[in-house]
């Protein structure tokens, strides 16, 4: 039996993180598209890792539980890397909320029930969660603590209160951050830690969809006018995840780390600020 990592989302960011911290472990790779999971599994196995692909639908509690049970058949779950999700250009409002918001909440909840003492998790949200106007304290608390099966019934998540897919995505990512804070308290009762990384524009297939989508010029302008002057890479996100998931990050839990090359800073206080 081995320590087991659950990696959800067979993409560049998830793989980069798993390669940093997953050596010596069994890595169960879950993705909505089995061919994606198989591709990442093959690449990692050929590099000496021990992985297996699995089909998983993040919007389904049943699918999430099945993935966790599969992982437990190899040993205790000691790490979670959640890099699954959809983008504003890929999905309608309802799907964004069901996958990115509800699905992430369920995953953190279910893994939190079984995570090994000393275990650690990281979930990938987005800088988008930082771009919205502040919610009320009550709305933030509801996003953090409402029972998962009641999340999508919250008033602020009803269709008439959501402008477009970007707004839905922002709400989902804000919820991810709040949910990590609340769930980290429960994980802590098991002696485990949980954190969130909110990347900016990182070059991945998902980002390339955005660059070529209806908001492509917006995103290209964003990294052209942020302090870093460029998009990020998956390895740069993995740099931070490696810290958070190592013993050097032992005092870090319930936190969100914004890694966006300064784009959010420029949005509020620089050339990316919206015109009045």
Residue ranges and their predicted role:
Residues 226-237, 248:
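A conserved structural motif in NAD(P)-dependent oxidoreductases
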Residues 85-90, 117-190, 199-204:
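Catalytic loop of short-chain dehydrogenase/reductase
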Residues 1-28:
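Canonical Rossmann dinucleotide-binding motif of NAD(H)/NADP(H)-dependent dehydrogenases/reductases
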């Amino acid at each position: 039996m081995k320590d087991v990592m659950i990696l959800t989302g067979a993409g560049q960011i998830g793989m980069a993180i798993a390669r940093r911290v997953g050596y010596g472990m069994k890595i169960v790779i879950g993705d909505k598209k089995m061919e994606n999971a198989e591709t990442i599994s093959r690449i990692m196995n050929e590099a000496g890792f021990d992985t297996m692909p699995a089909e998983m639908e993040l919007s389904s509690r049943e699918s999430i539980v099945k993935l966790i049970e599969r992982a437990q058949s190899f040993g205790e779950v000691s790490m979670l890397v959640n890099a699954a999700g959809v983008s504003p250009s890929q999905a309608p409002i309802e799907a964004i909320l069901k996958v990115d918001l509800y699905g992430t909440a369920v995953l953190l909840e279910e893994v939190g029930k079984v995570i090994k003492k000393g275990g650690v998790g990281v979930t990938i949200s987005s800088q988008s969660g930082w771009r919205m106007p502040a919610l009320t304290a009550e709305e933030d608390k509801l996003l953090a603590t409402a029972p998962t099966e009641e999340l999508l019934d919250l008033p602020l998540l009803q269709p008439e209160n959501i402008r477009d897919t970007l707004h839905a995505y922002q709400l989902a990512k804000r919820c991810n951050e709040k949910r990590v804070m609340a769930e980290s308290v429960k994980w802590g009762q098991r002696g485990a830690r949980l954190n969130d990384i909110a990347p900016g524009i990182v070059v991945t297939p998902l980002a390339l969809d955005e660059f070529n989508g209806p908001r492509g010029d917006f995103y290209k302008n964003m990294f052209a006018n942020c302090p870093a002057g460029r998009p990020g890479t998956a390895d740069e996100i993995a740099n931070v995840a490696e810290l958070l998931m190592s013993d050097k990050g032992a005092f870090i839990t319930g936190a969100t780390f914004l890694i966006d090359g300064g784009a959010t800073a420029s949005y509020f206080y620089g050339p990316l600020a919206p015109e009045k």
